[in-house]
């Protein structure tokens, strides 16, 4: 038995040494080719880019650059995979070699050996010694080479005349419901809807995110501690078209605490008509095309917040905009981040002097230019969504922010929870606290639901059910009505009708007028913490378990 074990160990030693020799040589050859792929230094690519400078509208040339770039990237990642896999294989072989060689040495005295070491010819002993030394020397050299000069991608060079997609048109954007509370975050549609239930369908996973709609598709997100998914339903009949999991190479870390009021899928997705984008409380953000194919996914790190993460995504052209307000202001963790919608790569990020918040950012148009409006503690801040540059700020908000800001005529209205309502002229630069605050009321403000503006009136709904109509020019209350329910869902406006949905699932249809007038009520039959969505003459509502469609 000892003889057999000795022979097996000896065979393993020889085989692992030969394997180390072969793989080490392959890695040395791979490294001698220089930095991987010529991704940036390719003369052919550089020449094509020079030509593109001269002919920026040459589509055939752009396509040629795109194809060459793909080939270079494939070659680059092929070399990277070879180096990484080879290094791992060498490490495994080295462990086997050392273990088996040690076993041979220990067994040597006991194992029957017709020719002892001292009985060998001196020439044979020298050959054996130098062979073993060569194997270990080559393995050490290869390991040292990889440690000192690892295979790396070249640093990212500035993109010159990058081929881009056709920009999304504002007409398409405005004809759909692509983001939280609609096109411009105001929760309004010009079309009226009827509280006539057309259908309801089960939603596969829980979530507090609201639906978004583009064309004939309704998108939502859902998650539990085991998986996170994006769903696509037929807007006409509610059929589930696809349900796709977010796939990453490594599991993402869950937040230390999960709040029941937010969970893992509280942020509402956003869509640009090509892809739908979703973010989850563990920091996973992903893009899917309209067929359900995952285009890209990445992790931003666990989004730790006292009440969970709930800021919905915003979008402008090819920028996916994410408000990350985390921890306390002193932690310096908060920022606004823009990702390339095509690739998920960072485009810009701007630090924020704020602590944790739960409000969602909104895009508004001011003087024909877009502004990204955000609420934080204590700042109401506006950014250029293209560059990330801060445009203006007002000190006037507070902690535990959940309501999102809106544009009411020419004023941005934001809420300081349970305290102030603030209206700001969004035309200044820098800190405009002393110059651009149009009015402020201090009689209390809603804690969770966001407000709505009908062109003449400003409506506020508190979490405890107090509905107020205010003068948007002064903030003065005109009338108030207690709906005697609790609310998380934001107010919405369909035509001339206010829609308010209580946490118990009671829908209130109220006339948007100079006096309170209840038009109709409808009970969903299940809890609801999401906001209503409109498309055409239909309204979509996500309940605790089902997606509902109302209309005609």
Can you annotate each of these PLM segments?
Residues 1-8, 97-132:
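Cytosolic-side transmembrane helix boundary signature
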Residues 11-27, 133-144:
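Hydrophobic membrane-insertion alpha-helices, especially the h-region
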Residues 16-22, 83-109, 211:
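Selective detector of the "anchor" transmembrane alpha-helix that sits immediately C-terminal
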Residues 30-48, 151-163:
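Alpha-helical transmembrane signal-anchor/signal-peptide segments
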Residues 41-80:
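Low-complexity, acidic polar-rich segments
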Residues 76-91, 125-129:
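Juxtamembrane/start-of-transmembrane alpha-helix segments at the extracytoplasmic/lumenal side
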Residues 121-152:
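Internal/C-terminal transmembrane anchor helices
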Residues 147-552:
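Noncatalytic, solvent-exposed loop/strand surfaces
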């Amino acid at each position: 038995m000892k003889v057999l074990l000795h022979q097996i160990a000896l065979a393993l030693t020889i085989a692992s040494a030969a394997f180390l020799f072969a793989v080490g040589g392959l890695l040395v050859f791979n490294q001698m080719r220089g930095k991987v792929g010529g991704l940036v230094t390719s003369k052919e690519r550089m020449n094509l880019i020079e030509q593109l400078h001269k002919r920026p509208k040459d589509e055939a040339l752009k396509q040629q650059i795109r194809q060459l770039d793909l080939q270079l990237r494939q070659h680059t990642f092929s070399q990277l995979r070879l180096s990484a896999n080879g290094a791992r294989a060498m490490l495994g072989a080295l462990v086997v070699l050392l273990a088996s060689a040690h076993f041979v040495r220990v067994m040597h005295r006991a194992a029957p050996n017709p020719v002892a070491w001292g009985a060998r010819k001196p020439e044979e002993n020298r050959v054996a010694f130098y062979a073993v030394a060569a194997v270990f020397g080559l393995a050490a050299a290869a390991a040292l080479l990889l440690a000192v000069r690892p295979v790396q991608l070249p640093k990212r060079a500035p993109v010159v005349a990058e081929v881009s997609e056709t920009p999304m048109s504002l007409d398409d954007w405005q004809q759909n419901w692509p983001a939280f509370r609609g096109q411009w975050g105001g929760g309004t549609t010009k079309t009226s809807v009827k509280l006539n239930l057309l259908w309801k369908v089960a939603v596969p996973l829980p979530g507090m995110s609201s639906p978004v709609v583009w064309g004939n598709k309704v998108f939502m997100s859902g998650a539990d501690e085991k998986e996170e998914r994006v769903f696509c339903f037929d807007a006409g009949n509610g059929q589930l078209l696809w349900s796709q999991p977010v796939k990453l190479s490594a599991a993402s870390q869950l937040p230390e605490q999960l709040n029941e009021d937010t969970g893992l899928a509280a942020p509402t997705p956003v869509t640009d008509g090509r892809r739908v984008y979703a973010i989850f409380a563990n920091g996973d953000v992903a893009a899917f095309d309209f067929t359900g194919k995952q285009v890209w996914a990445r992790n931003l790190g666990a989004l730790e917040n006292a009440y969970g993460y709930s800021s919905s995504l915003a979008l402008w052209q090819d920028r996916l905009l994410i408000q990350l307000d985390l921890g306390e202001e002193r932690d310096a963790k908060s920022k606004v981040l823009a990702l390339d919608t095509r690739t998920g790569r960072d485009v810009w990020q701007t630090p924020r002097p704020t602590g944790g918040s739960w409000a969602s950012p909104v895009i508004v148009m001011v003087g024909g230019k877009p502004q990204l409006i955000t609420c934080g503690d204590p700042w109401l801040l506006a950014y250029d969504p293209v560059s990330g540059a801060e445009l203006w700020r007002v000190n006037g908000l507070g902690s535990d922010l959940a309501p999102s800001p809106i544009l009411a005529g020419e004023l941005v209205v934001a809420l300081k929870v349970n305290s102030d309502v603030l209206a700001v002229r969004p035309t200044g630069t820098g800190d405009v606290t002393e110059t651009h605050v149009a009015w402020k009321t201090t009689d209390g403000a809603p804690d969770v639901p966001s407000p709505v503006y009908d062109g003449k009136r400003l409506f506020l709904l508190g979490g405890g059910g107090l509905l107020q109509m205010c003068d948007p020019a002064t903030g003065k209350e005109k009338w108030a009505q207690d709906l005697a329910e609790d609310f998380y869902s934001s107010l919405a406006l369909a035509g001339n009708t206010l829609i308010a949905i209580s946490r118990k699932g009671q829908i209130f249809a109220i006339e948007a007028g100079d006096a309170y007038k209840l038009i109709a009520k409808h009970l969903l039959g299940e809890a609801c913490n999401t906001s209503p969505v409109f498309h055409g003459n239909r309204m979509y509502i996500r309940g605790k378990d089902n997606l509902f469609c109302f209309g005609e």
